[in-house]
Structure formats: C-alpha cells, structure tokens
C-alpha cells in the first residue's frame, strides 16, 4: 500500500496475516491529527505497532522510534517496509506489551534485544494501539513512566476503562468513524 501524508509518501507492506487501518480515506487524517498534537518529540516507544501503519509516517517526527509487536508476520513486514522506505531511525523487536515492560524495567534479558541499546533512547512519548481488549495492567504501569501518551483505540468501552485506570489528563481527543453506520469508532487521545 502506498500512503501519502502531507508532503511525503510511504510504502507499507501488508498481507492477510496482519492488521492495518481499514479506512484508507481516514488513515491520513489520523496521522495528521497525531502530528499536529506532538509537542517536543524526542524518541518514541510504540507498543502494538502492527506492520507499521503509525510507525513509518511518524518516524520523521521523532529522533528515534522503538516499535514492538508480538505478531511475527507484522514485525517481518515492518522490517521490510523500513528497508523499502530507507528509514534509519526505527528499531523493532518482536515483544508483547508485557515483555516490553519487563525489558524496559531490566527485569530480565531478551535475546531479541541484544543488538539494541535501550539506554540510548530518550523517550518523550509512548504510543499504544492495543487490540479490542485494551491495555494490560503492566502496560498501564509502564505508560505512567512517560510524560506524553498517545492512545489509539478501536474499542471505546475498553478505552474508557483504561482512561480511568491511567488517571491522566486528556490533552486532545479525536474520533474517527472507520465504518459508517456502525458503532465501530477509532479514538485517538493525547494524554499527559
């Protein structure tokens, strides 16, 4: 898929084994909303990155991006997309949300991270785009370490549950109607 955002274009590889934003017309508007809200971006930690639908277009807004995803097909396609687009500031790892929290807390070593210098990151933002089940308690705890949080949700019910648990201030919020005439909505929220 070739995606155009503002004055740039990206090729994002996908197949039927991975998730990608379903509404091609709203997708650039979602990216635009996120980029307009960014304040003082340094490095980005992204959980549930999928095949890179947000990773690739947001990479130019951050010094470095560390993107994690548990689906091996998604990570493989993301790595290929990074090469295809000649991006050098993105590192990836196949880690679940809980494994990412463990890795950042230095609770145990991961061979999958042996070539990644986690200490070199100066994370200013965390971006989460969880499945419909929402965030795990470990991810909620991890996110509290970050001043800025971008929460993308396809399930308003679990989003509301998580917002209460997070106890953060909502800076801005946008709702995208991905499937007209249905109850399915995509929420993008900036939290501090």
PLM regions: where:
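Rossmann-like S-adenosyl-L-methionine
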Residues: 1-192
């Amino acid at each position: 898929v070739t995606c155009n955002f503002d004055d740039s274009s990206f090729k994002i590889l996908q197949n039927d084994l991975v998730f990608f934003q379903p509404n091609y017309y709203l997708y650039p508007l979602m990216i635009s909303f996120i980029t307009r809200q960014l304040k003082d971006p340094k490095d980005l930690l992204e959980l549930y990155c999928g095949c890179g639908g947000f990773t690739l277009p947001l990479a130019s807004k951050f010094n470095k991006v560390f993107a994690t995803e548990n689906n091996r097909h998604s990570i493989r396609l993301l790595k290929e997309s990074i090469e295809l687009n000649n991006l050098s500031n993105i590192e990836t790892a196949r880690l679940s949300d809980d494994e990412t929290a463990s890795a950042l807390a230095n609770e145990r070593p991961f061979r999958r991270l042996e070539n990644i210098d986690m200490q070199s990151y100066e994370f200013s933002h965390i971006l989460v785009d969880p499945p419909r089940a929402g965030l795990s308690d470990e991810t909620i705890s991890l996110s509290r370490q970050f001043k800025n949080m971008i929460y993308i949700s396809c399930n308003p019910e679990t989003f509301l549950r998580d917002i209460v648990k997070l106890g953060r201030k909502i800076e801005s919020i946008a709702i995208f109607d991905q499937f007209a005439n249905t109850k399915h909505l995509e929420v993008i929220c900036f939290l501090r």
